[in-house]
């Protein structure tokens, strides 16, 4: 194990949406050099094969209602190992900059004078659009995108989302972690006059061979989820750009 008391640095690395081949070259390189890799539950285990044989690999959970480590415990672990001079990686699914609780962890690290380097990953929404062969932007159909989290409903108590502004402020809307609160989210869309005919795609296990898609409308998707027993982890993309996928399939 490499010890260097002057390092005191943590790499926060995006593991991408799941497909190991979508891991960036830089992420692969730092994984090969790491002494300690602290990873989330949604990271594909195949990605850990890039770690050197004697690296310590620690799973910290982070699935809904099943956190093996609290956020504070994770931060403490990162700080402790970095202060020992070990090469530390915090490995997160997707891109850590999008709904990855990055802010909480980097503030803790900075407060202890620990340097960080963030290595972005491919976020799941991009993998979904690539798999289904539609763009997230289009000159006629979608010139703006909004990223939302479906978990905001039950977790946030202040500064709640201004749904009417958000829904009418973007052509394409991407909702991560949508499944648990899907009925509430659909109700919000409809309550501000959003069309029940608006296209939506719901995706589970983006980029992996076991991926699962549901294509429908705002008005039909809840029934489709119930009928198909669709499960997490999943995200939704809403907007007219989805129609390009259907057009391509007909060609």
Curated annotation (Swiss-Prot):
<feature type="binding site">
    <location>
        <begin position="123"/>
        <end position="124"/>
    </location>
    <ligand>
        <name>S-adenosyl-L-homocysteine</name>
    </ligand>
</feature>
<keyword id="KW-0934">Plastid</keyword>
<dbReference type="InterPro" id="IPR050161">
    <property type="entry name" value="Siro_Cobalamin_biosynth"/>
</dbReference>
<comment type="function">
    <text>It is a step in the biosynthesis of both cobalamin (vitamin B12) and siroheme.</text>
</comment>
<dbReference type="GO" id="GO:0009507">
    <property type="term" value="C:chloroplast"/>
</dbReference>
<feature type="binding site">
    <location>
        <begin position="93"/>
        <end position="95"/>
    </location>
    <ligand>
        <name>S-adenosyl-L-homocysteine</name>
    </ligand>
</feature>
<dbReference type="InterPro" id="IPR035996">
    <property type="entry name" value="4pyrrol_Methylase_sf"/>
</dbReference>
<dbReference type="InterPro" id="IPR014777">
    <property type="entry name" value="4pyrrole_Mease_sub1"/>
</dbReference>
<dbReference type="GO" id="GO:0019354">
    <property type="term" value="P:siroheme biosynthetic process"/>
</dbReference>
<keyword id="KW-0489">Methyltransferase</keyword>
<protein>
    <recommendedName>
        <fullName>Uroporphyrinogen-III C-methyltransferase</fullName>
        <ecNumber>2.1.1.107</ecNumber>
    </recommendedName>
</protein>
<keyword id="KW-0949">S-adenosyl-L-methionine</keyword>
<feature type="binding site">
    <location>
        <position position="17"/>
    </location>
    <ligand>
        <name>S-adenosyl-L-homocysteine</name>
    </ligand>
</feature>
<dbReference type="GO" id="GO:0004851">
    <property type="term" value="F:uroporphyrin-III C-methyltransferase activity"/>
</dbReference>
<feature type="binding site">
    <location>
        <position position="206"/>
    </location>
    <ligand>
        <name>S-adenosyl-L-homocysteine</name>
    </ligand>
</feature>
<keyword id="KW-0169">Cobalamin biosynthesis</keyword>
<keyword id="KW-0808">Transferase</keyword>
<keyword id="KW-0627">Porphyrin biosynthesis</keyword>
<comment type="similarity">
    <text>Belongs to the precorrin methyltransferase family.</text>
</comment>
<dbReference type="InterPro" id="IPR006366">
    <property type="entry name" value="CobA/CysG_C"/>
</dbReference>
<comment type="pathway">
    <text>Cofactor biosynthesis; adenosylcobalamin biosynthesis; precorrin-2 from uroporphyrinogen III: step 1/1.</text>
</comment>
<dbReference type="GO" id="GO:0032259">
    <property type="term" value="P:methylation"/>
</dbReference>
<dbReference type="InterPro" id="IPR003043">
    <property type="entry name" value="Uropor_MeTrfase_CS"/>
</dbReference>
<dbReference type="InterPro" id="IPR014776">
    <property type="entry name" value="4pyrrole_Mease_sub2"/>
</dbReference>
<dbReference type="Pfam" id="PF00590">
    <property type="entry name" value="TP_methylase"/>
</dbReference>
<feature type="binding site">
    <location>
        <position position="177"/>
    </location>
    <ligand>
        <name>S-adenosyl-L-homocysteine</name>
    </ligand>
</feature>
<keyword id="KW-0150">Chloroplast</keyword>
<comment type="pathway">
    <text>Porphyrin-containing compound metabolism; siroheme biosynthesis; precorrin-2 from uroporphyrinogen III: step 1/1.</text>
</comment>
<dbReference type="InterPro" id="IPR000878">
    <property type="entry name" value="4pyrrol_Mease"/>
</dbReference>
